């Protein structure tokens, strides 16, 4: 069986490689499409590949349950993505390029969903989930930065992306084998636990569907907000107010790491509050830039908040997935919801930033109200219990469900078939340390009769002394 350290390292590496392959492939596809289409066409083409990736994220749950899926799904995911990357490099027709791109991002979406599910399994119950998520995101950003800065564009760039996808496939394949080896034990535990008494906390954790749906809505709303902030930055870049180069993307890696550390404080008790503060900061920066402040403010806040946002929605669904009935579907739902919004609202967000300060203010207030409602619905404004508080709660529930002393004594009497008179003698002897003569007087029978009943009780219960009988009867 794998140690938790190795499982965690493999899942971190897989998520980092997915981030690198996904972002790098998106950047490469946009650049290739830009040689064949005008800017408006590139935006539409990018929307289609992001939509295809969402389909891949959602399809993985069904693919993983097909017969013998453990053997061929990881291979198909990454081999298909590699083949499509090579096709994007070689094709010169826009339609063919679009088809290859959509197919490739469908496969990348499937691989990404599996990488997220592996991460959710490896870090289930871990107090370091957000730090792991932020580290994986930062590593993927750094790999993409190095690929863009130091690797020549074209064939060498594609070779690096294919190498990343191949490494991702290898990790997914071997982690699947390890997961299958442990599955029988997990199923046995699940069947055994199904017969136990259900406590209120168990009922809450089995299927938190309501919270999951609110979380999807929250990601969609926040994606609208950050898309608007991105529109402010993009518009300023296009007008020449600022120059958005490649190096500021390093702030994404740094903010992802910081977000992971901050979110994990006291087992993510304050993650919702921190993200709410980041949201407020983003709204203020949008209004400030629209009102005439330096666009650099929007740029700084955008890169700072984007790392927090990615770490937030990834951690939120990784934490939620193991408690859902179809965890493979929900582990990557944060990325899927973000991608849906990225290709559906980018044009509307950019148009909004060009509509004037009043329109932006109204939209910001509406987004704030919707986001606040979604934060509450997702339960992110309720402080979750710490490990110590959970232990105390579980101990209290166990004490409440444990049989009482009266129930234990009644079960003891029934088990050994004691008569009513023997029961009276047993209760008197076990609850009173006085000599048998005084107990006999209290019961209104002779000492000889008490001794006879006591002898019968010793024989039935296989005890030999009054002390031993008392311990058995009292359950001590």
Annotate each language-model stretch with its function:
Residues 324-354:
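A late C-terminal transmembrane helix in Major Facilitator Superfamily
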Residues 108-123, 308-324:
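Intracellular juxtamembrane helix-capping segments at the cytosolic ends
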Residues 156-175, 359-382:
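Symmetry-related core transmembrane helices of the 12-TM Major Facilitator Superfamily/SLC fold
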């Amino acid at each position: 069986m794998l140690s938790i350290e190795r499982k965690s390292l493999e899942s971190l590496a897989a998520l980092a490689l997915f981030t690198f392959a996904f972002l790098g492939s998106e950047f490469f596809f946009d650049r290739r499409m830009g040689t064949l289409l005008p800017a408006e066409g590139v935006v539409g083409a990018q929307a289609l590949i992001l939509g295809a990736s969402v389909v891949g994220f959602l399809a993985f749950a069904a693919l993983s349950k097909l017969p013998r899926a453990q053997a061929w799904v990881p291979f198909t995911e990454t081999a298909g993505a590699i083949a499509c990357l090579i096709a994007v490099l070689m094709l010169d027709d826009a339609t063919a390029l679009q088809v290859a791109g959509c197919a490739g991002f469908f496969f990348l979406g499937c691989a990404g969903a599996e990488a997220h599910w592996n991460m959710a399994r490896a870090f289930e119950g871990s107090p370091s989930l957000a730090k792991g998520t932020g580290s994986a995101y930062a590593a993927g950003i750094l790999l993409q930065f190095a690929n863009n800065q130091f690797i020549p564009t074209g064939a060498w760039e594609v070779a690096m992306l294919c190498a990343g996808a191949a490494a991702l496939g290898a990790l997914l394949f071997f982690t699947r084998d390890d997961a299958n080896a442990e599955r029988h034990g997990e199923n046995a535990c699940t069947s055994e636990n199904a017969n136990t008494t259900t406590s209120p906390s168990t009922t809450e954790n089995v299927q938190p569907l309501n919270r999951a749906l609110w979380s999807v809505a929250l990601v969609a709303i926040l994606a609208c907000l950050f898309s608007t902030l991105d529109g402010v930055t993009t518009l300023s870049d296009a007008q020449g107010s600022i120059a958005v180069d490649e190096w500021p993307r390093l702030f994404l890696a740094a903010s992802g790491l910081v977000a992971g550390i901050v979110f994990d404080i006291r087992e993510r008790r304050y993650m919702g509050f921190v993200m709410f503060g980041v949201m407020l900061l983003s709204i203020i920066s949008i209004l400030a830039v629209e009102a005439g402040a330096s666009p650099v403010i929007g740029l700084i806040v955008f890169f700072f908040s984007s790392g927090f946002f990615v770490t937030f929605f990834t951690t939120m669904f990784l934490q939620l997935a193991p408690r859902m009935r179809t965890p493979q579907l929900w582990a990557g739902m944060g990325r899927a919801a973000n991608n849906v919004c990225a290709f559906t609202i980018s044009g509307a967000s950019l148009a909004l930033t060009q509509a004037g300060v009043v329109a932006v203010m109204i939209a910001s207030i509406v987004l704030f109200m919707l986001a606040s409602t979604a934060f509450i619905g997702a339960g992110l404004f309720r402080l979750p219990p710490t490990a110590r508080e959970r232990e105390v709660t579980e101990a209290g529930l166990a004490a409440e469900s444990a049989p009482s002393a009266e129930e234990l004594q009644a079960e003891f009497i029934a088990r050994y078939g004691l008569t009513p008179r023997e029961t009276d003698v047993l209760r008197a002897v076990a609850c009173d340390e006085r000599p048998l003569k005084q107990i006999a007087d209290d019961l209104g029978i002779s000492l000889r009769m008490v001794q006879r009943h006591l002898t019968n009780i010793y024989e039935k219960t296989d005890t030999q002394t009054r002390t031993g009988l008392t311990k058995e009867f009292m359950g001590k």
